[in-house]
Swiss-Prot record:
Keyword Nucleotidyltransferase on entry: no
Pfam families: Ribosomal_L13 (PF00572)
Organism: Arabidopsis thaliana (Mouse-ear cress)
Record-linked PANTHER family: LARGE RIBOSOMAL SUBUNIT PROTEIN UL13W, RIBOSOMAL PROTEIN L13
Keyword Repressor: no
Cited InterPro entries: Ribosomal_uL13 (IPR005822), Ribosomal_uL13_CS (IPR023563), Ribosomal_uL13_euk/arc (IPR005755), Ribosomal_uL13_sf (IPR036899)
One BP term from GO: translation
Chain ranges passing through the membrane: none
A GO cellular-component term linked to this record: cytosolic large ribosomal subunit
Protein family membership: Belongs to the universal ribosomal protein uL13 family.
PROSITE patterns associated with the record: RIBOSOMAL_L13
Gene assigned in the entry: RPL13AD
Protein's name according to its UniProt entry: Large ribosomal subunit protein uL13w
Length: 206
């Protein structure tokens, strides 16, 4: 995310679609400890290696881990994809120290792409992408699908909101494309009209 040891002062927005859970979490944890602010969007599209049935069995085994005398004391079993990812990152950070707690506070996680971040350029992390890290033909499942199987009730709502967001983004993109075409056309017309005068205007960057 950050080149070398330099830290980007701005908040980095990462599109988690088709990233591997563990690899994305480890890279994110490292950047948080280095002082980088990170926002992870579309957590429901994160990939887990292994089929859905296997991952669901693993999660059900995890659900059985509880405090016998008072289960509400923990461990807490998150169902939402964003909270599952947050907990994975927390496990890679010394979150009970001041440094670790400050690092974890720099992380924000969301399902879908909420309004402040839908207009910000999002990045991907090649070292965590499924297409580069998982063998072709290897089974995988999406975190959102797993969450919906174990008690998360907003899978369909997020899918609907994402469809609407993509439609709005497509309209904006088409409008931008038309404006670019008009600008290029206007520049050509201006060049034809100005002709030799361009040689005078170019050195002064007019």
């Amino acid at each position: 995310m950050v080149s070398g040891s330099g830290i980007c002062s701005k908040r980095v927005v990462v599109d988690a679609r088709h990233h591997m859970l563990g690899r994305l979490a480890s890279i994110t944890a490292k950047e948080l400890l280095n002082g980088q602010k990170v926002v992870i969007v579309r957590c429901e599209e994160i990939c887990l290696s292994g089929g859905l049935v296997r991952q669901k069995m693993k999660y059900m085994r995890f659900l059985r881990k509880r405090m016998n005398t008072k289960p509400s004391h923990g461990p807490i079993h998150f169902r939402a994809p964003s909270k599952i990812f947050w907990r994975t990152v927390r496990g890679m950070i010394p979150h009970k120290t001041k440094r670790g707690a400050a690092a974890l506070a720099r992380l924000k996680v969301y399902e879908g792409v909420p309004t402040p971040y839908d207009k910000i350029k999002r990045m991907v992390i090649p070292d965590a992408l499924k297409v580069l890290r998982l063998q072709a033909g290897h089974k995988y499942c999406l975190l959102g699908r797993l969450s919906s199987e174990v008690g998360w009730n907003h899978y369909d709502t997020i899918k609907e909101l994402e469809t609407k967001r993509k439609e709005r983004a497509h309209v904006v993109y088409e409008r931008k494309k038309q404006l670019n075409k008009l600008r290029v056309k206007a520049e050509k017309v201006a060049e034809e009209k100005l002709g030799a005068q361009l040689d005078i205007l170019a050195p002064v960057k007019y």
